[in-house]
Amino acid sequence: MGSRIMHYCITVQLAEKLKINSELLHLGGLAPDAIGSDDQSKDRSHFITPKENGKKRINLGLFLEKYGDRMHDPFYRGFFSHLVADYLWYDCIMVKYFKPLSMEDRRKAEKIGYLDFRILNAKLIDHFNLTECKLTTIEQSEMDIIDMHALSGVIHQYEADFIIDPIAESSPLRLYSFEDILSYLDCSVKETVSRLEEINRETKI
């Protein structure tokens, strides 16, 4: 799954392409990770369901069944973009970097990849010339899949992501290719825009 800064990169580009001037778009882009402490909370917030082969994937259709009538709201559009991006993370990143590995090597690669996120934060902020959008939690949400206390925590983590570690800024990536990450982000933006345009045509938002 992509990092907070990656999701923010996506919603920043969506805001420009869709002409959305609302912090709620960015808040929605982070919201799926505002989960509770139980084991199933991430599956619920990411609309993850088992496939016929027993493996789990994000079910975008399930999200639209539940919230499709609210897709005029920037928050829900941002939320949807997060799900699209996480869905594509498997196809664009997991298949290349993790699937060929043994379970032991995969665990090692996951740790290295997590450390790469700190380096990627600095690289992406610089590459896209990102500035921090001040986010505030919403008082309440009709989404019972979001933990509002956890959402405040996600916002604080997002704010901390903009505090660049000089060491990380000058460090090379150990696992990911920066070009692959940029390609993944571009694919996520294009796919989200395409799906939102399709929803617009169907519902005439």
Predicted feature residues:
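N-terminal leader/auxiliary helical segments
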Residues: 1-205
